[in-house]
């Protein structure tokens, strides 16, 4: 966990952070997927941004974008840091480098065909799939195909709305909460989300919880999400036919709470 979070017992918090996410990491590894890697790279990128080490930070973000396209959403974090032209330049540099790396093993025409196929797939599957996302849950409850583009736009506006509090941008806890909400949003509003994807969202929940002092309602919510996503799911999936939808409801709750927390004023800390 990035050290920007205020903490009194760093070692204990670090241990609890990874225990909280370990179940979803194990599921991701068993499924042979890269979601845990994406989550780790985004956390590393944030840590390097906090230390003003922009070259590795932008590299990690671009790598996540090439693995999972939504990883490019972490570029949003650039608004919090100085030297934005340098951040933009480094990002474009890494995009160019990674986009051309496959030329080591394929021809330019083959690479162009791969990118065209990638674009076709991305543009074509948005209308076909809902996955374990908010769209999937809404569709299963209503029996209708929800307007994904509209709902995605609304959710994006709601997530970005707290950024109008410019006076909080200098607070480490605020930047950490923005990252937490971004990690959760990437999953619950991703039409291709599946069970292994939730390691990313669970990292967001952990970042939210360890962003400042907590009270019993916060602890209960954390345990509720942990049990619903990482524990109960594996036990009841054989009993409830739509058990895959359960994890979304818990992540949705944590996402709404993260938005609420942005209106609070924890003790301010400065770098």
Regions found by a protein language model. Give the residues of each.
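Transmembrane alpha-helices and membrane-interface helical segments
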Residues: 40-51, 77-78, 82, 87, ...
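Voltage-sensor/pore transmembrane module of 6-TM cation channels
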Residues: 52-82
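Alpha-helix initiation/capping motif
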Residues: 22, 74-80, 107, 206, ...
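Hydrophobic transmembrane-helix microenvironments that flank and shape a buried ionizable site
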Residues: 30-32, 65, 248
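Juxtamembrane/interfacial segments around transmembrane helices
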Residues: 43, 65-71, 120-123, 139-148, ...
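Primarily membrane-embedded glycan-assembly and transfer machineries that use lipid-linked glycans
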Residues: 1-56, 81-198, 202, 271
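Aromatic-enriched
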Residues: 209-271
């Amino acid at each position: 966990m990035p050290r920007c979070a205020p903490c009194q017992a760093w070692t204990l918090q670090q241990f609890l952070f990874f225990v909280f996410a370990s179940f979803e990491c194990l599921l991701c590894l068993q499924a042979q997927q890269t979601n845990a890697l994406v989550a780790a790279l985004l956390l590393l990128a944030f840590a390097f941004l906090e230390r003003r080490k922009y070259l590795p930070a932008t590299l990690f973000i671009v790598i996540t974008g090439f693995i999972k396209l939504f990883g490019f959403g972490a570029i949003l974090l650039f608004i919090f840091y100085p030297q934005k032209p340098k951040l933009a330049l480094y990002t474009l540099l890494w995009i160019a480098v990674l986009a051309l790396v496959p030329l080591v093993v394929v021809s330019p025409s083959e690479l162009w065909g791969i990118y065209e196929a990638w674009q076709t797939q991305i543009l074509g599957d948005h209308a076909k799939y809902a996955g374990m996302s908010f769209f999937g849950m809404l569709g299963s409850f209503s029996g209708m195909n929800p307007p994904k583009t509209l709902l995605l736009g609304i959710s994006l506006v709601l997530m970005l709305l707290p950024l109008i509090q410019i006076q909080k941008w200098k607070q480490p806890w605020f930047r950490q909460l923005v990252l937490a909400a971004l990690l959760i949003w990437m999953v619950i509003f991703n039409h291709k989300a599946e069970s292994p994807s939730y390691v990313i969202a669970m990292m967001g929940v952990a970042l939210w919880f360890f962003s400042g002092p907590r009270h019993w309602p916060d602890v209960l919510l954390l345990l509720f999400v942990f049990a619903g996503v990482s524990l109960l799911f594996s036990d009841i999936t054989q009993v409830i036919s739509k058990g895959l939808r359960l994890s979304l409801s818990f992540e949705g709750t944590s996402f709404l709470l993260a938005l609420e927390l942005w209106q609070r004023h924890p003790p301010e800390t400065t770098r």
